Amino acid sequence: MTAIAVVGSQWGDEGKGKITDFLSKEAAMAVRSNGGNNAGHTIEIGDKTFKMRLIPSGIFAAKKGAVIGNGVVINPEVMFGELDNLEKEGIDISGLKISNRAHIIMPYHILQDTYQEEAKGDKKIGTTKNGIGPCYMDKASRTGIRVCDLLERDTFEEKLRTNLAEKNALFTKVYGKPELKFEDIFEKYLEYGQKMKKYVTDTSVVVNDALDNDEKVLFEGAQGVMLDIDEGTYPYVTSSNTISGGIASGIGMGANRLDTVIGVCKAYTTRVGEGPFPTELLDEVGDRIRETAHEYGTVTGRPRRVGWFDSVALRHAKRVAGINALSLNLLDVFSGFDKIKIATAYELDGEKIDYYPASLKELYRCKPVYEELPAWEEDITNVKTWEDLPENAKKFLNRVSELVGVPLVTVSVGPDREQTIVLKNPWEK
């Protein structure tokens, strides 16, 4: 296998960073193709913890470095802050490559995101207010500023003046907010462009050349399938395609180049922000899972909503993202529990269904149909092999795989890179 994609199969925060870091040890390069600094991921290596939002997780181990593709929206201030921190910790960032076609998050995007969300009041979506959505809006309306534009002074000046005229009219007339000044932005972002220049290239060529040479390439998805702009719980979704199809367009390659799509999931389910969540736990069990697993957002610090494992949502993710392998994290959270529940279906208006409804009204009426399994007492954080797992842990994992219809390739029993049980090396045919 030379091309592996790692996608979140729930609502994000599944632990994709850990499995991509683990897989990147064998990869020539690690590639990110969607989202922006709304996608937090945590990597633990030895006694060091790295929390990043934009730089691909694979930068720690991939032999030829990391790639930020054209589908990513880049906040230069955040990106250079992360790069500076990595350099201070002795991480080699010289192999980073940034697409010349990627779009830039501008200061007005962040303000627009904030003003729009505030104006919605109790109908807010739950955006991270990082300017991701407005940046993608400008991309779709063909007014966005790309990385290549920052490298051309005249082009950037013309686009910035045009965009500021439009944004300032919006801010002052609709939201009653002050204008942004051209001089506060122009030189600062030109400088970002010059600082970025040594990393900028046509990443589509770089990645496709690597695949043509049978090099191992790891593609890192951001967020999760259930947050996909088309296939997720719309409108409570992100602004990009988080399924594997979005990886192809977000890097500039054919969809047929992916060999394996690994869906990453937790042993339970979490979600940040608003939106339907059929298996949500609003009791002491949910609180226990949240505190045991430290379920607080990497980017926002917000407490994550917690629920039981939802196989209906996972089957939906499998279908729309082409998931053919499963990586399950945080199995160790259930040590000491009496029982674990898995949603095998929903009940909608008295009828049992096994699909994920598109209608929000229907989703809010769905009640999970649960199957109950016994948990285990043993501490499993030091378990290295499948054989050494408690029998009840094996039964739970086998049932998850059976219900989703996808084989497990890795199981995580702790946050460290080494706390990973490998059932099958995804790089091997």
Swiss-Prot record:
UniProt keyword annotation of Cytoplasm present: yes
Main localization category: cytoplasm
Family: Belongs to the adenylosuccinate synthetase family.
Job description of the protein: Plays an important role in the de novo pathway of purine nucleotide biosynthesis. Catalyzes the first committed step in the biosynthesis of AMP from IMP.
Protein source organism: Lactobacillus johnsonii (strain CNCM I-12250 / La1 / NCC 533)
Chain sites annotated for binding Mg(2+): 13, 40
MF terms (GO), sorted A to Z: adenylosuccinate synthase activity; GTP binding; magnesium ion binding
Domain of life: Bacteria
Protein's name according to its UniProt entry: Adenylosuccinate synthetase
Assembly information from the UniProt record: Homodimer.
Pathway entry: Purine metabolism; AMP biosynthesis via de novo pathway; AMP from IMP: step 1/2
Protein residues bound to substrate: 298-304
GO terms for biological process, alphabetical: 'de novo' AMP biosynthetic process; IMP metabolic process
Localization of this protein: Cytoplasm
Pfam families attached to this UniProt entry: Adenylsucc_synt
Active site residues per record: 13 (proton acceptor), 41 (proton donor)
Protein residues bound to IMP: 13-16, 38-41, 128, 142, 223, 238, 302
